[in-house]
Amino acid sequence: AAERYESNHAGIYEMCKKDYPEILEELEKEPFQDLLDAGCGPAPMISLLSEKYPERHYTGLDLTPAMIAQAQKKNIPNATFVVGDCENFPFESNCFDAIICSMSFHHYPSPQAFFNSVKRCLRPNGRLILRDVTSENKVLVWLMNTLEMPLANLFGHGDVRVPTRELISECCEKSGLKLEKFEIRKGMR
């Protein structure tokens, strides 16, 4: 998967690329100096950000060593890449102004642990930009969580669950984060 991620035959990974302009637009609303990309894969978003803002520092975190190896091959001078768990960030407290997580949250078995790590590692007034698959249609979410996610796991995709607005809101509240905006765009996005 790591080698395929940024190819023209990436399949599901193509969905991630559609998020980049909106993530960039959201990041540009407030200044940041240190950014974490949680579930960074081979770091396509960090590559784009580093070109646009070379004076800032970026950290990529991914559980998969092959993804981090691909990211490191890019030799991004203002970036650090770490193999680690997005449910238990291996970083000191208050070390990031912004954390982005694009299309990896549905892989996390313990969503609350992720939000707790975000809260611990964000500086005061820092922000999380989370993009993932979801829907307001409870039947569709049930079908995906009952059928599609388990089938995807049979093929090694590591999917766990489609998060809902309720799950995100509850996790934010329990971790002490303030949910400022929750949008569902174009069907499952």
Residue ranges and their predicted role:
Residues 1-30, 44-48, 67-70, 129-152:
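Conserved class I S-adenosyl-L-methionine
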Residues 36-38, 42-88:
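Class I SAM-dependent methyltransferase SAM/SAH-binding core
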Residues 103-104:
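Short catalytic micro-motifs in class I SAM-dependent methyltransferases
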Residues 112-124:
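A short glycine-rich, Lys/Arg-flanked "PGG" loop and its adjoining helix->strand segment in the class I
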Residues 160-175:
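Short alpha-helix
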Residues 180-189:
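Conserved catalytic loop of SAM-dependent methyltransferase domains
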